[in-house]
């Protein structure tokens, strides 16, 4: 493939119009402050890849979950590190994940849940404008996947006007 080839990181729905799916997508877009359905489809594709890998690992172990867990220990460790799985979860639990589990790990959602914005949209704006840091580094991508270890390190940039507790745009809870 040539350099700079256009590749999509998501799959679109098979059927262009299904009223129930469209309504569900609209609800998720408003609840998580997503700008367009491409962001949702990207999360769904990521979840699909996780489930595909879990099925492959379980299949290679012929249904033996202990052997599958040994083979997929790195895969499980990665999902536990980013907070999609809990410490006691196994490969079988990956198959029961939902797209909301992926969307909850986005920087935009974590910043909103921490109270850095009054709405998910406001948290997204603060991130995009460079007001939020993770581990002291400015991150301007709302789709950044937050590790469990980084969750406590999300805060306003000290040079940002929003770092002042009395700033009018700060969340009321702080």
Swiss-Prot record:
Disulphide bridges: none
GO BP: any one term: ribosomal small subunit biogenesis
Subunit structure, interactors included: Part of the 30S ribosomal subunit. Contacts protein S5. The interaction surface between S4 and S5 is involved in control of translational fidelity.
Function, in words: One of the primary rRNA binding proteins, it binds directly to 16S rRNA where it nucleates assembly of the body of the 30S subunit.
Similarity comment: family membership: Belongs to the universal ribosomal protein uS4 family.
NCBIfam families named among the record's database cross-references: PRK04051.1, uS4_arch
Protein name per the record: Small ribosomal subunit protein uS4
Organism of provenance: Natronomonas pharaonis (strain ATCC 35678 / DSM 2160 / CIP 103997 / JCM 8858 / NBRC 14720 / NCIMB 2260 / Gabara)
Classification lineage: Archaea, Methanobacteriati, Methanobacteriota, Stenosarchaea group, Halobacteria
């Amino acid at each position: 493939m040539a350099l700079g080839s256009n590749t999509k990181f998501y799959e679109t729905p098979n059927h262009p119009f299904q009223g129930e799916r469209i309504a569900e997508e609209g609800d998720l877009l408003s609840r998580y402050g997503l700008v367009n359905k491409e962001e949702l489809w990207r999360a769904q594709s990521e979840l699909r890849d996780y489930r595909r890998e879990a099925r492959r690992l379980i299949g290679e172990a012929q249904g033996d979950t202990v052997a599958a867990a040994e083979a997929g220990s790195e895969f499980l460790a990665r999902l536990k590190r980013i907070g999609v799985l809990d410490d006691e979860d196994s490969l079988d639990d990956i198959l029961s994940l939902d797209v909301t589990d992926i969307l909850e790990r986005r920087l935009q959602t974590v910043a909103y849940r921490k109270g850095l914005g009054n709405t998910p949209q406001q948290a997204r704006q603060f991130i995009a404008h460079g007001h939020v840091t993770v581990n002291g580094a400015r991150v301007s991508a709302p789709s950044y996947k937050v590790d469990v270890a980084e969750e406590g390190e999300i805060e306003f940039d000290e040079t940002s006007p929003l770092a002042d507790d009395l700033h009018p745009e700060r969340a009321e809870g702080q």
